[in-house]
Amino acid sequence: MKLLGNSKYIFVVLLLCISVFLNGQETLDEIKYSEEVCTEQIDIHILLDGSGSIGYSNWKAHVIPMLNTLVDNLNISNDEINVSLTLFSTNSRELIKLKGYGSTSKDSLRFILAHLQNNYSPNGNTNLTSALLVVDTLINERMYRPDAIQLAIILTDGIPNDLPRSTAVVHQLKRKHVNVAIIGVGAGVNNEYNRILVGCDRYAPCPYYSSGSWNEAQNMIKPFLTKVCQEVERIAHCGKWEEWSECSTTCDEGRKIRRRQILHPGCVSEMTTPCKVRDCPQIPIPPVIPNKIPEKPSNPEEPVNPNDPNDPNNPNNPNNPNNPNNPNNPNNPNNPNNPNNPNNPNNPNNPNNPNNPNNPNNPNNPNNPNNPNNPNNPNNPNDPSNPNNPNPKKRNPKRRNPNKPKPNKPNPNKPNPNEPSNPNKPNPNEPSNPNKPNPNEPSNPNKPNPNEPSNPNKPNPNEPLNPNEPSNPNEPSNPNAPSNPNEPSNPNEPSNPNEPSNPNEPSNPNEPSNPKKPSNPNEPSNPNEPLNPNEPSNPNEPSNPNEPSNPEEPSNPKEPSNPNEPSNPEEPNPEEPSNPKEPSNPEEPINPEELNPKEPSNPEESNPKEPINPEESNPKEPINPEDNENPLIIQDEPIEPRNDSNVIPILPIIPQKGNNIPSNLPENPSDSEVEYPRPNDNGENSNNTMKSKKNIPNEPIPSPGDNPYKGHEERIPKPHRSNDDYVYDNNVNKNNKDEPEIPNNEYEEDKNKNQSKSNNGYKIAGGIIGGLAILGCAGVGYNFIAGSSAAGLAGAEPAPFEDVIPDDDKDIVENEQFKLPEDNDWN
């Protein structure tokens, strides 16, 4: 911790870190690899069993060949593997010493093994301990190479003579870093002992022990060869890298490369790493909208379809004036040389055509070319297409086609390219057969052939039967044929004025009887449906204004059908019994005690101008509400008196002259059965309660002695906080002097009992006692403070109460105070 607090130490550590970092940048790249190395410096000590248990045959056939295999697989040299050989039986003998003959050369070692195979015969016992001690002596004398690995290989077929001694020497060699391996050959090998001798567990795998028959001796040596030739991890320096090249791209992510020369086969000569210089500018993405623009013109091509009906090539549009076939039509009737003119007037077969039974109606029409009834043909309901043919002459075909495309379809089903229905030269005879006009008929307006227009595209098969038709002499009749004078029969064209029977055709206005579909206007008699205004007959429902006849509900005033009872509008709510009497006589107050609260007074009997005469009322009989003069008055239930501290008692009415006072009034109010209210301190009348069992008498009370009004005056309720039991009204008789008030001692005593006594005396006494206590406390505190301060100043002054104790007794007292517990008498 002290070092961490030392700034110099921290500075030195920082410098070391920087230097290591800089040196690390200059170090060559290194790679780690492993390879099998058999040329390491190893000293192999071979201990060969030459006891008689092996036998000469095994010695010659198996033992010596196994040693030759081991030598052949080792890299024996002066610097790498050195070999020593010791033969043990009863005694041990070192055949090859380390760094001696045959120790560093394979050829020398093979020669020794061949001589041993031919000249030695196994004999004696197994003295393994003596051979182990030879190896131990080499280690102790440092006859080995300190950098070399020490390995001892034992070849035996039996159990050593001294097991404990042999085991002890093996452990001693292991402590000196000598590895021991055993190869057991033959039938008498003790495997358990050999495993313990090597240092392996009894049942665990042991790499330093191998056993088997003599035939397997050469195979058993191979595991030991792997121990000698081990894989060693090595580090190779691959060389220094060159500088990094520039990034492969000028923007965004790229790669850079560096190279070096190969110094080892496992090294890499080239290295790449990602790099990034800067972000590349974003390339604007072409808008997608221009790609959609060519698709949009395809939409306008859709309305091209409505123009298809106006296509001049449309064969279904007979009304197109631009029909290229029409201009050739007018030339056909003007051609006098036309041999195919079916309208030859000399044609005798034409009259037979009207006999065509397939069209019985057509012969009637051509017989009268000027038939004014032709205009009625458009009215033929069976052929509504007829009126459509003349109309294209007078109407705009473009206007008519969209409105009625269907009427135009029947004529175009069999269009005639030679049809003179060209609007430029109308044929006056077309109305003769408006159903199927024949372009060649105008040549003979007088005798049209109705059957020819039945198939205008194909000539009448009867025409070739006309012998006169090839005769051109009739063609001079074509002077008639050039019925151009008949073209002035265009005056017959004014028969088109008959065609303006199309005004009858505007019987289609009868078709616009679809306006009669606005008979829905009759349906939209919804104007009549706005009879919903009649539904708002709810205005009649707003007869609810009659419902607000709820003002008639205030007919509840009529509910008090007792007009006599409400005849006194001044009668108050019967729930307030005290107030209803006030309006009864506003001039003279009424004593509420004289009234029976249980018997409501009749407002009709009360006279606001006259006081109530108690004699006129029958005091003996209670007022019966059923005896009221007006039977319509509904009497209220009797109201019991209630306590109301806010009500000021009203002085009684003093009867005037002519009024008799009841004679049964007591002279002293205390003797009366009537409970007189007495005010409390709070201003409440304690006697005016529901618990009172006394009632106002209904019988006349005898008047007192000389003063007939005294008894009545004694019934006056006492005002609030008054000590007088008798209060006289000044309005009784102003001439009479007020009588002296007689106090009631009993009432005073009762009132004083209810009042709480004043606590002022206790307050004064408490104040005096508190003051004295404060003074006493102040004096005691002063004496205590003065005594303690004086003792501190005086020093060795006597303690308090010390002068009280005699001098002779002071020592005794002090001794008594400082006695030990065991010295006490009570102990």
UniProtKB/Swiss-Prot annotation:
Primary localisation category: membrane
Annotated membrane topology: Single-pass membrane protein
KW Transferase (keyword) present: no
UniProt region (Disordered), positions on chain: 278-761
Residue stretches of biased makeup (Polar residues): 657-671
Record localization: Cell membrane
Signal peptide: 1-22
Bias type Basic residues, positions: 392-407
Keywords: Cell membrane, Disulfide bond, Malaria, Membrane, Repeat, Signal, Sporozoite, Transmembrane, Transmembrane helix
Residue ranges, annotated region (29 X 3 AA tandem repeats): 306-392
Transmembrane segments: 764-787
Disulfide bonds: C238-C267, C247-C275, C251-C280
Basic and acidic residues bias (residue ranges): 709-724
Matches recorded under SUPFAM superfamilies: TSP-1 type 1 repeat (SSF82895), vWA-like (SSF53300)
Ranges of biased composition (kind: Low complexity): 301-388, 465-567
Residues annotated as domain TSP type-1: 235-281
Domain annotation VWFA: ranges: 43-228
Cellular component terms per the entry's GO annotation: plasma membrane
Sequence repeats by residue range: 603-613, 614-624
The protein's name in its UniProt record: Sporozoite surface protein 2
